[in-house]
């Protein structure tokens, strides 16, 4: 048993926090890409709010993975992951919505296409890049094709 304290709840509004259970798998990714007001993008979120919203996603990923993490480690991974995503100019990760980020991380942790050895900045970032190259790219292309 460990003596670690439970993770504190972030200061962001509860309704805005995208948890791993909140995403709707029936929503078409093309619809998500077409409607940035309904599905806000990470690039449109202020840095402090983005870290606060990423924290429960990372914490949920650690719980799903069965990996024990303290609050400081979760905040570190969330902060580093947000910084990496916002600095990305090659793969288009800045245009991902919070719903997509939660979905991708959940699928990666629960046994997606690649083997995931633990929850870290590198593994979560790798899952997001793989998504952006495949499904995300296809959804982006279809979203902006003329009808």
Task: Give the location of each predicted region.
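Charged interaction scaffolds used for protein-protein
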Residues: 1-147
């Amino acid at each position: 048993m460990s003596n670690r304290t439970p993770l504190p709840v972030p200061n962001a509004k509860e309704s805005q926090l995208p948890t791993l259970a909140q995403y709707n798998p029936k929503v078409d990714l093309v619809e998500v890409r077409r409607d940035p007001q309904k599905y806000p993008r990470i690039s449109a979120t202020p840095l402090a709010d983005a870290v606060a919203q990423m924290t429960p996603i990372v914490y949920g990923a650690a719980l799903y993975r069965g990996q024990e993490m303290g609050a400081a480690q979760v905040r570190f991974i969330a902060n580093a992951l947000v910084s990496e995503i916002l600095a990305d100019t090659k793969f288009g990760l800045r245009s991902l919505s919070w719903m997509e980020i939660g979905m991708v991380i959940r699928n990666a942790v629960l046994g997606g296409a690649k083997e995931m050895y633990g929850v870290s900045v590198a593994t979560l970032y790798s899952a997001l890049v793989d998504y952006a190259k495949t499904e995300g790219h296809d959804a982006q292309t279809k979203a902006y094709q003329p009808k």
